[in-house]
């Protein structure tokens, strides 16, 4: 279909700011002919429409969560190591503190022990110099010792003794029916003294002996014996003493006794007639 030639079209102008036109000043607008040059009666076709832009692409998917930077992980590991080291140092300090406490406690006990040992040494030295004035009662009870004195109403043989009153003493051994009974085997010093006196003198022999009885022996065993003869002057008062003493190895259940030949001539004063022993 042919378009009418007299259809009015707006004129199109090309503008060239860099080229100068011979018909006008530089930068002037040149009219664009509406018809095709060389082809009168035909109009220039309209310019093509601008190209349509494609639709924008969809937004890219969200990227995954990024891993923590290497520096952050290193900082985390460093903090964990520092925490572990702190606890290790704390445990070491606690152990060191406990060790120092135990060492202080041991030093204190050692000082107390040294002080106690020093005091005991000083006390022992003083006891050696001035003697033990007040010995413990336990030591007195454990000491095997006896000192018996004469008994005025003694009328039998062997002699009977006073074991309770006056200066009499019995400890660690037993007094029974005129004799001392040994409870502990060991070495003993045994002694006896008898004082004889008379209004007149007939010079009869005077015997004084200490003997032992034990179920192991069939008869009495004489340990010590003394005999006096010609000890006085006829017709005069007289007094003589007999003393016996020696060390013996005695066993448990041994019984010790004292016998004299003339009981009527014995003076039973506690300072003159006595019988005793003590364990060495």
UniProtKB/Swiss-Prot annotation:
Compartments in which it is found? Cell membrane; Cytoplasmic vesicle lumen; Lysosome lumen
Q: Looking at the record, which segments are called Disordered?
A: 20-71
Enumerate the Pfam families for this protein. Answer: TNF
- Cystine bridges: 201-232
Q: Which InterPro entries match?
A: FASL (IPR028326), TNF (IPR006053), TNF_CS (IPR021184), TNF_dom (IPR006052), Tumour_necrosis_fac-like_dom (IPR008983)
- Give one GO molecular function term: cytokine activity
Q: What does this protein do?
A: Cytokine that binds to TNFRSF6/FAS, a receptor that transduces the apoptotic signal into cells. Involved in cytotoxic T-cell-mediated apoptosis, natural killer cell-mediated apoptosis and in T-cell development. Initiates fratricidal/suicidal activation-induced cell death (AICD) in antigen-activated T-cells contributing to the termination of immune responses. TNFRSF6/FAS-mediated apoptosis has also a role in the induction of peripheral tolerance. Binds to TNFRSF6B/DcR3, a decoy receptor that blocks apoptosis.
Protein name stated in the entry: Tumor necrosis factor ligand superfamily member 6
The species this protein was found in? Felis catus
């Amino acid at each position: 279909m042919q378009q009418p030639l007299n259809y009015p079209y707006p004129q199109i102008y090309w503008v060239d700011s860099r080229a100068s036109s011979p018909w006008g000043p530089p930068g002037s607008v040149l009219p664009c002919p509406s018809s095709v040059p060389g082809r009168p009666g035909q109009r220039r076709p309209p310019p093509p429409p601008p190209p349509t832009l494609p639709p924008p692409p969809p937004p890219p998917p969200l990227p995954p969560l990024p891993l923590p930077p290497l520096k952050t992980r290193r900082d985390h590991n460093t903090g964990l190591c520092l925490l572990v080291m702190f606890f290790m140092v704390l445990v070491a300090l606690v152990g060191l503190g406990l060790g120092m406490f135990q060492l202080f406690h041991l030093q204190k006990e050692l000082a107390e022990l040294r002080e106690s040992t020093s005091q005991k040494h000083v006390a022992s030295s003083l006891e050696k110099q001035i003697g033990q004035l007040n010995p413990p009662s336990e030591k007195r009870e454990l000491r095997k010792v006896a000192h018996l004195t004469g008994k005025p109403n003694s009328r039998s043989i062997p002699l009977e003794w006073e074991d309770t009153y006056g200066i009499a003493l019995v400890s660690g051994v037993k007094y029974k029916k005129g004799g001392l009974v040994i409870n502990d085997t060991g070495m003993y010093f045994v002694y006896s003294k008898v004082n004889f006196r008379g209004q007149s003198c007939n010079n009869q022999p005077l015997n004084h002996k200490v003997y032992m009885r034990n179920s192991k022996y069939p008869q009495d065993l004489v340990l010590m014996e003394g005999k006096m003869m010609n000890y006085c002057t006829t017709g005069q008062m007289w007094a003589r003493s007999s003393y016996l003493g020696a060390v013996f190895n005695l066993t448990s259940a041994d019984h010790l006794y004292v016998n004299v030949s003339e009981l009527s001539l014995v003076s039973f004063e506690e300072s003159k007639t006595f019988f005793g022993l003590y364990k060495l």
